[in-house]
């Protein structure tokens, strides 16, 4: 007897070359969206204020809150990434930017806050006031350690107070710098001791020196104040905020990944609409060879098989979700996808078996959906529309019918693909925007104010019970007002 063909329907071909007829014995399984389930209340001794929301983002990087902002051009750039990291999450800077510009956004986040500025910018005594001001203006700093040109030994510090009233750009640094009574510490100084020294001497910067009196770091009042204001901030081992950035497949994606790693990014996200594909698997494998320190998140997938393939390629976390987003039309336009609750439930099980974190990406409309996603097996969730109307999201606030809004669009919308995200949907070779096949729409969301107020509303855990059928609604555009229709999608009613 010939062995039974167990290959997927899409690969079963008759001898004539025509696709085989589907096996009528195949069972169509039920799949659930977030709206199909509710948390079943149960006895608890844990008060909401004592809930621990720490979780993993990747194999080696953790989060203090289970929230990640999505790599969308109306959601995450430097400002959102800073705010997310300060509150304990992480932001993924979108790739609809030139490579240099995206790398600059990463550097902005990494330099925004430091426990100690390692290897700070320095200047030599024989340089000029013009040189000093150029450094201060370019890097937005108010003080520069002065070191000997040959030995690197610390000889002074030049601050705004030293140069404020100087008018001759040819003046030498040694004529202006503060050289007496320099307050220095070693790299092992305790934060409380550093704060005490700053207060006692009424200064804003502590110079960190090594045994040879070379300047190896800088501790500033601003950074200490930021650390005190945001105790849950997600930081690396040097006290800098953590940040992720998106890239694509192919040579452009690889070049982008190299630039992002050079800029100091913590996590690279290989961001595509269909992660279970040869190009994505190859991209993950190549990026993993670039750095041992940088973690790689890959996606999106909605099946256990897709997750297993990405894990085998070396992915450090898996992004789950095809089509659940409020501005995504993939399921309707392409007829592809899995309702998000079931996708997370089934796919996260594979991730858990390999000790790889799972990220639920899309379909999160309320804090209750976060609870359901985490209970289904996700380690954290990626959100877009919930953050799109905040101050930190890119774009301006505009008035419509007397109310304030901000723009929000899917990365599969015509506008986003024309700007640079077409490769996410494997349409990068199409130059005529009229020939692009969009899988998202452009819309508006209500203005929400600072992101801190939104983040405050989202953190919990639990179990579920099915209640209703809501998969179709999740597959369609929801929770935004469409301002520009895609040519292949129209919502009736």
Residue positions per predicted region:
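Alpha/beta catalytic cores of nucleotide-metabolism and tRNA/nucleoside-modifying enzymes
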Residues: 1-43, 123-124, 185-186, 196, ...
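Active-site-adjacent beta->alpha loops and helix N-cap segments on the catalytic face
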Residues: 49, 98-107, 167-170, 214-234, ...
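Bateman/CBS regulatory modules and CBS-like beta-alpha motifs in cytosolic regions of diverse proteins
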Residues: 51-63, 70-72, 101-141, 146-149, ...
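Short beta-strand/loop segments at the ligand-binding rim of alpha/beta enzyme cores
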Residues: 62-69, 115-120, 180, 236-246, ...
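Catalytic cores of alpha/beta
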Residues: 79-82, 255-263, 296, 302-320, ...
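Glycine-rich phosphate-binding active-site loops on the catalytic face of alpha/beta enzymes
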Residues: 86-101, 265-277, 316-334, 364-398
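Catalytic beta/alpha-barrel core
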Residues: 92-96, 122-123, 143-145, 184-186, ...
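Terminal amphipathic helices with adjacent charged low-complexity linkers/tails
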Residues: 95-110, 146, 151-167, 198, ...
